[in-house]
Curated annotation (Swiss-Prot):
It comes from the Bacteria. Belongs to the DTD family. It comes from Dichelobacter nodosus (strain VCS1703A). It is found in: Cytoplasm. One of its GO terms (biological process) is D-amino acid catabolic process. This is D-aminoacyl-tRNA deacylase. The lineage of its organism: Bacteria, Pseudomonadati, Pseudomonadota, Gammaproteobacteria, Cardiobacteriales.
Amino acid sequence: MIGLIQRVERASVCVEGKEIGAIDRGLLVFVGIERADSAQQAEKLAQKLLNYRVFEDELGKMNLNVQQIGGELLLVSQFTLAANTQKGNRPSFDPAMAPQEAEPLFDYFCQTVHTHYPHTATGRFGADMRVHLINDGPVTFWLHV
């Protein structure tokens, strides 16, 4: 399971022209689910995400996590993160989990995060989404569990 996290001043996601999720300061997290992923990876990524220290302390060092700063999370599914880009000029999505299996796992991941930290918004699995964000930094990390 992959989490591409971006530190943001604010972010939102729209489907069919309607905003369905928005956050202020916090983390925008694009989530890619691979074929072999399970609830175990979802739980591990949730814990890593909630505890990953990407916010600056009073000395300017990245030493605080999203919970410590009272930030928010926006979780957005993105199957393209699981693409194989090693060969040719077109990505292969064979490593990505099939949508009918990935959707319940994404939902489980979101519920797990929300249970531990309720300041969480989500996109809509499988939808054509418009994601708007203002990066802070920019600070972007690839978490792969």
